[in-house]
């Protein structure tokens, strides 16, 4: 497509995107005035409260349009940048802050080049995708640096508050954004799903506050907390920008935007701080492949000619050694390995999956008993199902077991994958000391053992304490 034609197409799409906001503002003015106004004379529409209420949304759309047009200009075409870092720099759009907190965090990163090297190396797998998604939405590209702060670009990161993944979603917020969390998969760690959810959330917060710094504060602290801080300053006649609200924020949130600013400054000019960024090509690192049938992670890695660790780095959402196939199941592979996977899969003459599920019906079943039943070892079952030592399975639990000849050609159903849970309890000590207590009854003395308290452990997609930041 020629450049002029491309720009014309984008401008036409932008006009369609902006049309609803103009239409809503116009209609609000007409309805509030309760009198017909010719569509050809919109300047005559009075600025009613309803129209004014529409203006933040319209202003946000216009700002997004400005950023999109900037990316189309000859000097800032993102596809012309030599690497992803240059592409990110060209899309910076959040106002800078310059205070002592920023200086402190710049110094922290600048004096830890090893940390920066590890983080940027991990980021090289994912950051092109994040930048591309930001540009599609007309959002500031420095938001692609937020996982530096959240997770150090480690998709396996898991906090003490049960936040997980690149973008550190807690379970409840993850469910709010349709991030599935089951025994087999946690989409909070999935690169595609979590990035889509995080950008949707950030855009929603920006639409709410009309300010990216406040949107970031709300991402960390919660929108309700930011709203209350704004109301408090408004009541005192004080400004409500991020720095004016900082004294009302917890330390983590007060440092959150300055940390992002520090990373932003370093990416903008690493040489100024004696640092070097790795070259990250301005092109996709991975591609997505649909997988409609079950496949073991080890088999998928083998077919793609990848190490298991590298495969898991791109597909960290899978919790078990088997990937449940389905219409929405995708695996990510480096561009050069995707073709190898397709070729090797076509020539593969063996079963793709060696696992199926088994539901516990007995009141309590030992792992050793199950291992014997399915021709494997207790250690294999514990490792496949993340079962700690000295625990047993309770009735209703679903676990992975090796396939038998009867189940070799059967995949695990989506219904089972979505509903499976695992209930564990601590094994009874083999030599539990029986404390005896005397109970007088009918002139006779009886003895009875004191009951043992058996702690229960639930694993899978259960609830956990929500993290304050989300």
Locate predicted features.
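Extracytoplasmic and endomembrane cell-envelope/extracellular-matrix remodeling and assembly machinery
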Residues: 70-125, 136-137, 181-184, 188-208, ...
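Active-site-adjacent bridging/hinge elements
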Residues: 143, 174-176, 231-234
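An acidic, Gly/Ser/Thr/Pro-rich helix-cap/linker signature
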Residues: 2-9, 21-138
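Short, surface-exposed glycine/acidic/tryptophan-bearing loops
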Residues: 100-101, 157-178
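Bacterial N-terminal signal peptides
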Residues: 11-19
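Alpha-helical scaffolds flanking conserved acidic
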Residues: 140-147, 164, 212-217
């Amino acid at each position: 497509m020629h450049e002029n034609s491309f720009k014309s197409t984008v401008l036409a799409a932008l006009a369609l995107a902006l049309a609803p906001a103009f239409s809503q503002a116009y209609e609000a003015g007409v309805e509030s005035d309760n009198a017909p106004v010719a569509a050809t004379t919109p300047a005559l529409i009075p600025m009613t409260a309803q129209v004014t209420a529409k203006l933040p949304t319209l202003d946000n759309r216009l700002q997004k349009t400005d950023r999109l047009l900037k990316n189309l200009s000859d000097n800032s075409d993102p596809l012309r940048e030599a690497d992803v870092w240059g592409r990110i720099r060209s899309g910076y759009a959040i106002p800078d802050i310059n205070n002592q907190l920023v200086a402190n965090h710049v110094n922290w990163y600048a004096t830890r080049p090893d940390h920066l090297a590890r983080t940027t190396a991990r980021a090289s797998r994912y950051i092109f995708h994040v930048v591309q998604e930001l540009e599609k939405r007309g959002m500031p590209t420095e938001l692609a640096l937020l996982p530096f702060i959240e997770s150090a670009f480690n998709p396996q990161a898991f906090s003490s508050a049960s936040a997980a993944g690149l973008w550190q979603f807690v379970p409840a917020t993850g469910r709010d954004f349709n991030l599935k969390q089951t025994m087999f998969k946690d989409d909070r760690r999935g690169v595609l799903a979590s990035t889509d959810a995080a950008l949707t959330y950030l855009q929603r917060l920006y639409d709410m506050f009309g300010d990216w710094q406040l949107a970031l504060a709300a991402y960390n602290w919660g929108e309700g907390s930011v709203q209350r801080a704004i109301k408090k300053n408004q009541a005192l006649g004080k400004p409500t920008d991020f720095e004016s609200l900082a004294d009302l924020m917890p330390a983590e949130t007060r440092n959150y935007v300055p940390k992002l600013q520090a990373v932003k400054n370093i990416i903008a000019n690493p040489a100024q701080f004696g640092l070097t960024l790795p070259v990250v090509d301005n092109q996709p690192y991975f591609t997505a492949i649909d997988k409609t049938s079950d496949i073991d992670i080890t088999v998928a890695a083998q077919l793609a000619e990848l190490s298991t660790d590298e495969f898991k780095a791109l597909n960290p959402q899978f919790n078990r050694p088997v990937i449940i196939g389905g219409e929405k199941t995708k695996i990510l592979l480096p561009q050069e390995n995707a073709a190898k996977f397709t070729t090797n899969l076509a020539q593969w003459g063996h079963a793709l999956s060696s696992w199926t599920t088994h539901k516990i019906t007995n009141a309590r079943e030992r792992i050793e008993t199950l291992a014997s039943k399915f021709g494997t070892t207790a250690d294999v079952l514990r490792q496949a199902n993340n079962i700690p030592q000295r625990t047993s399975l309770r009735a209703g639990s679903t676990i992975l077991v090796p396939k038998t000849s009867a189940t070799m050609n059967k995949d695990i159903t989506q219904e089972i994958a979505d509903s499976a849970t695992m209930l564990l309890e601590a094994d009874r000590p083999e030599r539990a000391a029986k404390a005896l207590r005397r109970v007088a009854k009918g002139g006779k003395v009886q003895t009875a053992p004191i009951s043992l308290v058996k702690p229960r452990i639930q694993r899978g997609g259960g609830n956990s304490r929500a993290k304050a930041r989300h």
